[in-house]
């Protein structure tokens, strides 16, 4: 059951990503030859109009295959016959649709569970917060100039800036205060602490829920970007990275744990995970790497600036090399995921 749930979540997110490309392609008069879910040989398919819709053997990934996207075509409705701005809109639509999906799911989640405001609930003696005079009821507004909307953002900031001092702006009784906190290592918990605990959950009205749904998506975008920075700087290693196999396992474990509290709790937990994955997929696809949407956008933006398209053969070669490297990375990550399952 847990594998089915995980594959269903992946499928919904991937289909919506590809629908972004599909709908914008149609809106710009581009011929779509095939719209598929999965990779590899076709298991099932049918043709409606000019487009073939198919289900592939391997249940990871998907594609919106447009006429003339990767090769020359004399068809006036080919991708490369359209204006550079039309092509930019089609390529960017996939990641943007991921963020839209994350927002919709976040709104449903926030309406049902509320959101954690960054209000201090308890201050621990012997740590910087108590020494600075912070009290329960203080609301964290900024950390080193970064706006804070959820208490989770405090924890994330501490993770991405472990052991670093931070300038905290907080509010008490309508007045703003600023102090600098130097974290102290907690031997028992095995981490650095500023010395306060929060996480008060509140229920908002419609407008507040809409606003905090945007913040929810922003939170996961920031978390993804912060994690990528840690990967580049060595804060995390490839052993800490999970691919499809690892995510399926994590989703399955999360489902089995949450369903013990009822199907409603499991539904909300799956929504939470879907927000994370959808926002993550949007960010990853916007990375300026060959073969990804972000890599294609780089070439299109260069074309828009210089007013002339880069040699299609050279661009195709760059994307091909990038795809091979990406596939190699996926194999490494998948092997690592499988290895961790048996540890």
What is each residue range found by the language model?
Residues 3-8, 88-89, 100, 270-274:
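Hydrophobic alpha-helical transmembrane segments
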Residues 135, 141-142, 156-198:
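PDZ-domain C-terminal substructure recognizer with occasional recognition of PDZ-binding tails
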Residues 78, 82, 186-281, 298-321, ...:
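Functional transmembrane alpha-helices
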Residues 10-14, 65, 98, 102, ...:
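Alpha-helical transmembrane segments of multi-pass membrane proteins
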Residues 129-151, 217:
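Conserved PDZ fold ligand-binding element
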Residues 51-54, 58-122, 328:
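Internal alpha-helical transmembrane segments
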Residues 3-74, 284-292, 297-306:
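Small-residue-rich helix-interface/hinge motifs
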Residues 28-33, 113-130, 135:
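Alpha-helical transmembrane signal-anchor/signal-peptide segments
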């Amino acid at each position: 059951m847990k594998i089915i749930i995980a594959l269903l979540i992946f499928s919904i997110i991937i289909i919506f990503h590809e629908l972004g490309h599909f709908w914008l392609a149609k809106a710009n008069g581009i011929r779509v030859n095939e719209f598929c879910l999965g990779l590899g040989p076709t298991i099932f398919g049918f043709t409606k109009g000019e487009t073939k819709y198919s289900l592939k053997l391997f249940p990871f990934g998907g594609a919106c295959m447009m006429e003339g996207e990767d090769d020359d075509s004399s068809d006036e409705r080919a991708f490369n016959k359209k204006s550079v701005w039309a092509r930019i809109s089609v390529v960017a639509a996939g990641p943007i649709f991921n963020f839209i999906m994350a927002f919709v799911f976040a709104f449903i989640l926030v309406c049902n569970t509320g959101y954690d405001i960054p209000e201090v609930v308890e201050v621990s003696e012997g740590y910087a917060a108590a020494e600075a005079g912070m009290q329960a009821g203080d609301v964290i507004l900024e950390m080193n100039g970064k706006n804070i909307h959820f208490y989770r953002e405090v924890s994330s900031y501490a993770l991405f800036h472990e052991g670093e001092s931070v300038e905290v702006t907080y509010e008490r009784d309508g007045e703003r205060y600023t102090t600098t906190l130097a974290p102290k290592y907690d031997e028992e918990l095995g981490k650095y602490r500023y010395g306060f605990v929060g996480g008060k959950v509140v229920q908002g009205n419609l407008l507040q829920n809409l606003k905090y749904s945007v913040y929810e998506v922003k939170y996961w975008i920031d978390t993804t970007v912060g994690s990528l920075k840690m990967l580049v700087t060595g804060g995390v290693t490839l052993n800490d990275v999970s691919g499809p196999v690892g995510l399926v396992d994590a989703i399955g474990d999360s489902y089995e744990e949450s369903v013990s509290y009822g199907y409603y709790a499991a539904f909300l937990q799956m929504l939470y995970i879907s927000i994370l994955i959808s926002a993550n997929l949007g960010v990853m696809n916007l990375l300026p790497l060959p073969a990804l949407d972000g890599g294609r956008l780089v070439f299109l933006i260069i074309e828009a600036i210089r007013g002339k398209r880069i040699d299609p053969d050279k661009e195709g070669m760059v994307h091909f090399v990038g795809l091979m490297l990406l596939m190699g990375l996926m194999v490494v990550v998948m092997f690592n995921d499988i290895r961790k399952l048996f540890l």
